[in-house]
């Protein structure tokens, strides 16, 4: 392991930014600054007084919609270099990235240590960009912890990114030899190309260098025992175009696809023994969402093609098993019409439900329905036992992709404490 990271260190130093944005400072300096629990003059005063909240503000203010993560990546990399981390900017290629704007993952660890505990989240966001703002209308008794911070990424997942960094700095202040690694990836919102690039690289060796991986996503400060699996596909129908005044001269792809869509839409509510998708006590029902339908060219033309995008959240079973169920459902609903079929090759492979660890006391436990980068990181076996995986973070997924994305100061501060608790538990297992 040490030889791998020595080689990587040389590469990182060669590629280091020529214009660091922060003055050098040792790790052993106070890093978190909690606002006073008393009165305050303005929300801006509270943010400015806290290095942690100021850092969160700074990264939320940088637009980083998927494929445009370069600037926020450089900001985070410079911040960590200034605090004596070895920083590796791992290039991640994308056909949609902006010209001259290289995308990269940020992998960082204290310069004197080989990381054994990996702390990770993502730095990309969904569109559109929403500027950073503060709201004190909901504060109670002039309590700074109730200040609401809004903006794209304030929750998903820059809240986790900021809290993870400052939790790590807190731990390193007390224990400079803690073997921590920080990984902030691109592209989580669009398929996980950043995490897959890391997973397939020498930075993720076999056997695993990491005995613990802590993932950051909005979990409302609960420790997640697992999340549903995922399968994406299209339902495709082929017809024959004709003038709408003479529809018998053509074949309507829309008419052909409707029975298949109706059947697929209900698969999560149909018992598995009757041809539906499986459920489980832990995750409940598998859910199906027909998110987009594209068909026809005009109202006066019999449609020759129809395509529907479908997302399935798997509560049990494997993607291959679900594919077989979908194929049978489409075939049965259309009486075996060969012009209507499920197309799986245009979507990613999918993954089964992901079970996670919850053996650290002091957290509420929950499951979630959304997808994460957890399945995109291949976990290699270790001789000393299984690699533990945790999923935790501040904020709610219910606002994460909406125009009301927001988080409170109190939740951000509690997340630092939560991540520190997870890190300290991992250190005790060394």
UniProtKB/Swiss-Prot annotation:
Any GO molecular function: metal ion binding
Alphabetized Pfam families for the sequence: M20_dimer (PF07687), Peptidase_M20 (PF01546)
Signal peptide range in chain numbering: 1-16
Glycosylation site list: 84, 285
Top-tier EC class: hydrolase
GO terms, biological process: proteolysis
Cysteine pairs bridged by disulfides in the record: none
Entry EC number(s): 3.4.17.-
Residues that bind Zn(2+) 1: 156, 189
SUPFAM superfamilies: Bacterial exopeptidase dimerisation domain (SSF55031), Zn-dependent exopeptidases (SSF53187)
Residue positions binding Zn(2+) 2: 156
UniProt keywords, alphabetically: Glycoprotein, Hydrolase, Metal-binding, Protease, Secreted, Signal, Zinc
Compartments, record wording: Secreted
Cellular component terms (Gene Ontology): extracellular region
Main location: secreted
Family the UniProt entry places it in: Belongs to the peptidase M20A family.
Protein name according to UniProt: Probable carboxypeptidase AFLA_037450
Biological source species: Aspergillus flavus (strain ATCC 200026 / FGSC A1120 / IAM 13836 / NRRL 3357 / JCM 12722 / SRRC 167)
């Amino acid at each position: 392991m040490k030889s791998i990271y020595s080689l990587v260190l040389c590469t990182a130093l060669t590629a280091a930014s020529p214009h660091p944005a922060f003055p050098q400072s040792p790790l052993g300096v106070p890093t978190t600054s909690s606002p006073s629990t008393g009165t305050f003059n303005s929300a801006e005063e509270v943010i400015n007084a806290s290095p942690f909240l100021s850092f969160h503000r700074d990264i939320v203010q940088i637009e980083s919609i998927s494929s445009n993560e370069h600037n926020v990546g450089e900001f985070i990399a410079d911040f960590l270099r200034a605090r004596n981390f070895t920083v590796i900017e791992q290039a991640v290629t994308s056909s949609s990235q902006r010209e001259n704007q290289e995308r990269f993952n940020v992998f960082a660890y204290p310069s004197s240590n080989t990381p054994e505990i990996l702390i990770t989240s993502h730095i990309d966001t969904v569109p559109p960009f929403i500027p950073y703002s503060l709201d004190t209308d909901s504060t109670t008794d002039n309590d700074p912890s109730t200040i609401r911070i809004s903006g794209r990424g304030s929750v998903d997942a820059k809240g986790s990114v900021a809290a993870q960094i400052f939790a790590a700095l807190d731990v390193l202040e007390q224990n400079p030899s803690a073997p921590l690694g920080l990984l902030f990836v691109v592209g989580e919102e669009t398929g996980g190309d950043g995490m897959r690039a890391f997973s397939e690289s020498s930075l993720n060796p076999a056997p695993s260098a990491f005995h613990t991986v802590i993932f950051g996503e909005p979990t409302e400060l609960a420790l997640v025992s697992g999340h549903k699996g995922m399968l994406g596909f299209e339902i495709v129908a082929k017809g024959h175009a004709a003038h709408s005044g003479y529809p018998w001269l053509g074949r309507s792809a829309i008419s052909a696809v409707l029975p298949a869509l109706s059947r697929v839409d209900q698969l999560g509510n149909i018992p598995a023994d009757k041809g539906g998708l499986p459920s489980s006590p832990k995750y409940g029902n598998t859910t199906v969402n027909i998110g987009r339908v594209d068909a026809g060219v005009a109202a006066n033309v019999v449609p020759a093609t129809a395509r529907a995008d479908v997302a399935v959240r798997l509560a049990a079973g494997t993607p291959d098993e679900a594919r077989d169920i979908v194929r049978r459902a489409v075939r049965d609903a259309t009486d075996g019409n060969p012009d209507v079929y499920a197309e799986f090759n245009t979507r990613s492979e999918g993954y089964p439900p992901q079970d996670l660890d919850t053996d650290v006391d002091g957290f509420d436990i929950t499951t979630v329905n959304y997808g994460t980068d957890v399945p995109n990181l291949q976990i290699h076996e270790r001789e000393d036992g299984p690699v533990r995986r945790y999923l935790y973070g501040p904020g709610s997924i219910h606002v994460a992709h909406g125009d009301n994305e927001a988080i409170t100061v109190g939740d951000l501060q509690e997340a630092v404490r939560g991540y520190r608790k997870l890190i300290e538990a991992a250190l005790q297992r060394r």
